[in-house]
Amino acid sequence: MSQLAQAFAAHDLKLIEITPVELDRRHWLCVGFEEAGEDRGDFMHLGFLYADQAEFVAAPDLHEAVAGYFSGRDRVLMRLHSECLLGDAIHSTMCDCGEQLSLALNEIARKGEGIILYLRQEGRGIGMRNKLSALSLQYGFRHGQQTGHRHSSDNANLALGHEIDERDYTVAGNFLNALGISSTSMITGNGAKVASIANAGVRIIETVDLWAQDLSDRAKHEMEEKRNRGYRYARYDNDDEEAPARPAAE
């Protein structure tokens, strides 16, 4: 077992594989990992690591290169992204998820270093099957039949017996600790993500505010719901002078 795999195991993670991948003609490293004791099969979490100057692709030992590069590093730019198949892969305009991921990838590449943590948390943790049911409620259907009543995204989850947000980010903090990262700049407006990473002992130097300006009406409504839950998007808020004050995310 490599030193890196041992570090993952020490933080309750199982390191599956590391491989170079090409994203927008740039080489990143994709790290597949699972939570200890949880066999996710093909649905493992993914970490995408970028360090342009490190030349990972030419490294004789990827495990050693990753462990040596990130250990003790400060202000590592990072996006903790929850899976959204419709937004990320199909480029749905119902939400800003795909645009958030694209903006983060581009910003990390521009900076020359960073991490995308891609957690398999479809539908804010309720899974694809339940997400489809929630989307149906949002468009006024139930089991394929028109009901005449449309739910908001949050209320659709509640109507199905779920919490508004069932995600847990412990695994993300464990991942950063396994790499030995000291501090991070997080690309997020979600206070729950910030709090979870901070609770894992990783210092948050700053939060980076990236948001899509050209949103559909549907996506704008999703954004408004998130702001009502305490999300903070400073530039989005400032651009909307009539928006009521939002509670600060802790």
Q: Where are the language model's segments positioned?
A:
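Catalytic domains of riboflavin
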Residues: 1-250
